[in-house]
Amino acid sequence: MNEQIIEINLNNLDEKYEFNKIAKQASGAVMYRQGKAVLIAAVAVDEKAVEEDFLPLTVQYMERSYAAAKIPGGFIKRETKPGDFETLTSRIVDRSLRPLFPKGFYYPVTISVMVVSSDSEVDMQVAALHAANAALYVSDISVQRSIAAVRVGKIEDELVLNPTLSQQDESVLDLLVVGSEQDIIMIEMRAIASEKIDDIEMDMIDPMMGGVPLILEHQECNEVDNEALVDAIAFAAKAIEEASAIYEKEFTPVMRTPLGLSLAEEKVDEELYAYIKENYSEAVAKAISHMAKSERSTELKKVRAQIMEALESEGKEADKELVSKVLDRYKTTVVRDMILDKGIRADGRGLDEVRPITIETNILPSVHGSCLFTRGQTQALVTATLGDKKDAQMFELITDKNTQSENFMVHYNFPGYSVGEAKFIGAPGRRELGHGNLAKRALEPVIPINYDGTIRLVSEVLESNGSSSMATICGGALALRAAEVDMVELVAGIAMGLVTDGERVAVLTDIMGLEDHDGDMDFKIAGTRNGITALQMDIKLGGIDLITLKVALEKAAQGKDHILDLMEEAEKKMESSQALPSTEHFSINPQKIADIIGKAGATIRDIIEKFEVSIDLDRDKGGVKLSGHDKEKVAAAKEHIEKIANAPVRKQMQYEVGKTYVGKVKKIVDFGIFVEMPDGFDALLHISKVAKERVNNLNERYHEGDDITVVVMEQKGKKVELATPEYLA
């Protein structure tokens, strides 16, 4: 295999693909370059298929520290578990490439993407998608389609294709679309809040203010309306169609000889299918009417047992696995036919109907803010905890040399018992991180941009029958309100579904787990009354036209507004939590911040211990934030700090070099004695200048509070050096 290099300049990306250069024993591999970024993508396949009817695909996106000329921090100097960005990127690549595999392909496949050189301007998610796609397309697995990824930003009201990371900082839209020449496969979107300065009419300027206009700022959530979103997706789709066609044309000559792996045939025993349809249609319809997954599974097992018993009594073959497969196929048909033929869903709802919702707030007395949000048989207990700046999550990005901090976190937990399964509760998996990230993207635009503390939302999914991430968003918004976070708007989330037979199309509002499993689309939308703040869409049927997308968005808006009505009613009945911390914000002279901190932090530590408060200081602006559980102690701490700040500035006393003074021993340390001089200023008597002979233990000679005679040897500003008369004798 000869090395082949393909360069493609498209959609504001300059890409170089180097094939047959690295990892030649893999099924497919590529070295991908964009700017200074270099990624290695490799695909491997096990030629022994699994027995289960699913594709065992594993995607790993990995960032190496050396790619940014860094050594891993901490005690372990090698890469360990993946960070959140790596996990979320792995998930995006998986969701984008999984639909490319042919039906009946049940062979274990691993796709590994490794960043070996970084670039501070390169979008690593788009780069990872393109590198993984190239390695898969040219592999001996013989995938027939290539995908392309496009990120769309909006800067100064203009849509921008594949903005650099610097441009993304200026954008109010983050839209990632992945698709092939024929279809859109995956969409992720989030709105990005910004601050806007209001224009003040000249005749509104108060002459008493000296004719100087006031600067008024307010936060724009930058929600996206339906029409603007469809336009942005259409803008991305056009670029994807062109790019994927070019990728296929350029990569096809590099494709390896196919392995010729056989695909599992999806055989349906037509006779058994007809038998079940004729004799058990009512039993199946009754079984699927149970909304809970565990109950439905139990009822379907009973139907299966009845079928097997009947077949055996008639002298027919009754293979348990075969009956289960055919019964599951018939169940799916029943669910879909009810929707398309009658406009009725398995639980009896209409297509546009939202499940019953109940909301309880601040049900946990020791928590800052809480909400128990129940929609049908999906239930989330969401809590909000408020902290200081020091509570922010610190992390690193391979594209940035500086340590990052995250002061708004959403953690989503999905225990097995929420779906009736006996599972050990361990560390969060990819799905939990993904759902938490979706909820964060939905809520972040309404959190004050300049929020000066830290917020942690935790969603405990107690029961799940679809849309648990959307319940997290709804419960999270109300938990934030319960914690008295000054949010711009309430946010609600709703999951939409789609069922089609190619001719007829039914859009479903607020889908449950059964409809997610047997439907053709999972479309999660969250936002305020003004528009969409976050969206996630995975399409199973191969594509979606813009007309159907518009219908889904309109129906989602109706469902979202209905949920917001209920949330607003719950907010009116909300009572403040007794556990909320008391906070005080005020300003002092920035030059006095050093006095508040004190030497080596002694003063601020004393304040924290005495008044049981936490303190955040802004050294540049003189801002002070106090937090504590006792309102009176917080007020007393404020008074104490203001007293220090308002105290007159003492001028540093000028001591006469060579003159003898009597001071007090303030503190004894290993290297000397801190002496309180006349007028209260401190000076250092070094251990080497206590006596002519070597002194090993100062505590044998002096005690704190003792008077001590010293001679000033030197003074440089506030730094005063001393010696004893004994040393100078």
Swiss-Prot record:
PROSITE patterns referenced in this protein's UniProt entry, alphabetically: KH_TYPE_1 (PS50084), S1 (PS50126)
S1 motif domain mapped to chain residues: 658-725
Gene Ontology MF term list: 3'-5'-RNA exonuclease activity; magnesium ion binding; polyribonucleotide nucleotidyltransferase activity; RNA binding
Record's keyword terms, sorted: Cytoplasm, Magnesium, Metal-binding, Nucleotidyltransferase, RNA-binding, Transferase
SMART domains: KH, S1
Main location: cytoplasm
Cofactor(s) the protein needs: Mg(2+)
The protein's name: Polyribonucleotide nucleotidyltransferase
The species this protein was found in: Sulfurovum sp. (strain NBC37-1)
